[in-house]
Amino acid sequence: VLKRFSLISLAILGLYTAFPAQAQVLVPHVLQLDGDQLEQQGLILAQEAVQLAQFQQYQLALTRAQLASQLVPNNAQVWALLGGLYLQTEQTDPAVKALNKAQSLDPKNAAVLFALGSAYFRQEKYDMAVQYLKMGLQIKPETPGALFDLGNAYYKLNRLDEAIAEYEKAVKVDAKFWPAVNNIGLLRYEQGKTDIAISQWRQALSIDDNQPEPKLALAVALYGQGNQAEALRMGEAALRIDSRYGEIKFLQDNLWGQRLVGEAKKFLALPKIQQTLVELKQKSSGQSNPGQTN
């Protein structure tokens, strides 16, 4: 798993209680506003942006947050909100600029530091990601999502023992944090410790049996051990939950290593699995073209 829990979303929602509730909405043609009024209107816009973000209306939220940052340029929370929304809309470069501004105004804000770590990770600047995630964890050490992200950054730097250590810390903080359990399995499989990997994926599924990634990883590993019936059943179930796991690029994006990807290619090429993928693709095409007739 690359990223399952959005620290950015948590930071955005956390701002919801930080902005004062206002009954009025922004009046579009207000003349001669003084500094206090401008600040109030900026905070109203920021509050609206948070509310829109809660309903996943990110582009509308972003427009309001951009204006809010102009009206309240010295408010770290507004800049953090703007940076988070840029990340949410896959605009990483402006996200880093906004988050750096937030951090300059509030250096000890762990959520901002975590968000910067996430942003640098997306830019593939893994050393920078490690730096900012560790800074945030010095302030809030028991944050499982940040520990998980730090593990992923170490994974990308091929610092595997450190990655596993961070994943294990995340699970110690939150025993139900299945992505960290899953990723320990990914690493152990690459190390040739197949039985340990299988145990990790079974543990992840005991936490949430509806997660396709540990289900498919377990299927691939079991097939390699000759347990074909269970492997095919689990693999088909995983793909029916999320057919993207039938794409090798998607597996690689989610930190599947070379050894597991190699076995996954063989598994996904099996006639039964290919039949399932074709069926799912046809079903998806039918849903996207409901008015089309033969």
Language model segments and positions:
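Structural marker of alpha-solenoid helical repeat scaffolds
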Residues: 71, 105, 139, 173-174, ...
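Helix-start (N-cap) detector for alpha-helical repeat units in TPR-like alpha-solenoids
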Residues: 35, 42, 76-77, 110-111, ...
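Alpha-helical segment of the N-proximal tetratricopeptide repeat
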Residues: 38-77, 81-91, 118, 122-125, ...
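Terminal, low-structured helical/coil segments at or just beyond the last alpha-helical repeat
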Residues: 24-38, 237-294
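TPR/TPR-like (Sel1-like) alpha-helical repeat modules
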Residues: 202, 206, 212, 216-247, ...
